[in-house]
Amino acid sequence: MTSPERTEHLVLPGVLTADQAAHTVRGILAVQREDGAIPWFRGHHLDPWDHTEAAMALDAAGEHAAAARAYEWLARHQNPDGSWYAAYADGDPHDVTDRGRETNFCAYLSVGVWHHYLSTGDDAFLDRMWPAVVASVEFVLALQQPGGEIGWKREPDGTPVNEALLTGSSSIHQALRCALAIADQREEPQPDWELATGSLAHAIRSHPERFLDKDRYSMDWYYPILGGALTGERAKSRMEADWDRFVVPGLGVRCVVPNNWVTGGESAELALSLWVLGESDRALEILQSIQHLRDPESGLYWTGYVFDDKAIWPRELTSWTAGSILLAVAALGGDEATCAVFSGDRLPVGLAPECCGAPAGGQ
């Protein structure tokens, strides 16, 4: 059982006490199946990205064995082409409810594996997971376009969807950097990954026209920052430009404008993005503003709140919402592994392409 002593570093004024943090971790553990799968909640589906985020939160809370089981579930049920399906009913690997294979879902394993290694120093774990990391990266990079962006999925029949999503590609950028860190640790250079990472970063920084227009979604606003492609003054300018458009003071972050709906996951990710920019005070304010989503009985968090109607919606207590909040708190609390995978200055950057005369960095 998770004790408050194991979650003392997850204490944050106005956000979590040690007891509350331990309660939240127990809530995620209660959702996890014996085989390691972490669905959104029991009876709902599992997707590989949110499963990984919840596992990272378990590592941040010191629940390393449970996190390892989550990653081993992914390794056991990886498709021969290196992918995972988009949805599994209640985390049952034999009950696939969406046979699409989304690139950002598949890439995120590398973030979780590197985070687990930094949390534990477990070389044997890294050895076991390396083949799955390699296969997943190769699946993802097979959909990279000539302009650097990543096509967002393969259809169930294998047809590639070459259109790219800015949020998904930004998440993939972080994942590729973590994959390069794993390769460096293993002393197995991956020059093709370095080129792919640099090309993707350039597309995110300099070519918005290469991505589908999802400007209404808050994730497209902050993910280039959270994924590490956009840094420095350009990142700060982007944050300020749409702040009033997406942030609802005292309530959290809109998922999509103009809907009057704030969501816990987006709010926690924005807080992480602010931490990346060195704006910990504003990150804390965002996390404090979403405590109205906390369910005191389970320790988990409601997905969202429609503030015009003063209504929780949907009425779902998701493992990944709790996971995102724990990770944001862990970063603000200085958890070394969490800081390393989200801080832009602690991961390999890849090789910038010679294109447009653009600078290699994100300034």
What are these language model-derived features?
Residues L10, G43, M56, D98, ...:
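Generic anion/oxyanion-binding catalytic loop in active/binding sites
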Residues G43, W84, L230-M239, V256-E266, ...:
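CBM-like carbohydrate-recognition segments
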Residues Y85-R99, G151-A164, F246-P249, Y305-A311:
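Acidic/His metal-coordination segments adjacent to aromatic residues that form catalytic metal sites
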Residues L12, D47-H51, A55-Q144, L287, ...:
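Aromatic-rich carbohydrate-recognition surfaces in CAZymes
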Residues E5-T7, V15-L16, A22-H23, D47-P48, ...:
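Extended ligand-binding clefts on enzyme/binding-domain cores
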Residues I28-V31, A61, L74, D81, ...:
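Alpha-helical solenoid scaffolds that mediate protein-protein interactions
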Residues M1-W49, A60-Y88, V134-A135, V140-G147, ...:
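Low-complexity, Ser/Thr/Pro/Gly-enriched N-terminal "stalk/linker" regions
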Residues T2-G14, T52-A66, Y108-F125, S170-E187, ...:
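Well-ordered alpha-helical scaffold segments within catalytic/enzyme domains
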